[in-house]
Amino acid sequence: MQGETSLSFPAGHPVFAGHFPGQPIVPGVLLLDAAVHAVQQALESGAGAATTCQVQSAKFLSPVAPGEILHLSWSDSGTGQIRFGIAGPGRQVATGVLGFGSPA
C-alpha cells in the first residue's frame, strides 16, 4: 500500500495562537496527526477494519509556516510498518515510521 495527499494548516488555526505568538510554526504533533489520519483512512478503505497506531519513529527536519502547502506520502514496508515523509517547497519537513495493528 502507498499513497499521497496534500496538507495545509491555515493561519487562522487555533494552535498558532500559542505556537508561537508573533512567529507561528506548525507543531510536530499536528504533522504526526495528519500522517496517522491519512494512513488510517487508507487502511480502513482497503481492509475495512479499525486499527491501532504506534509512532515508532519521527524526525522533524524543518519548520513549517502557517498556510504552507505540504506533500505527505507513505508506503508499506511489507512488515506492518508504514514509512511516511512530509515535504514542503524544496525541502523535507518530516519523516517517520508508523506501526499499525488490530485493536485489542
Where are these regions (language model features)?
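A generic structural signal for short beta-strands and their flanking turns/coil linkers
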Residues: G3, F16, A49-Q56, E68-L70, ...
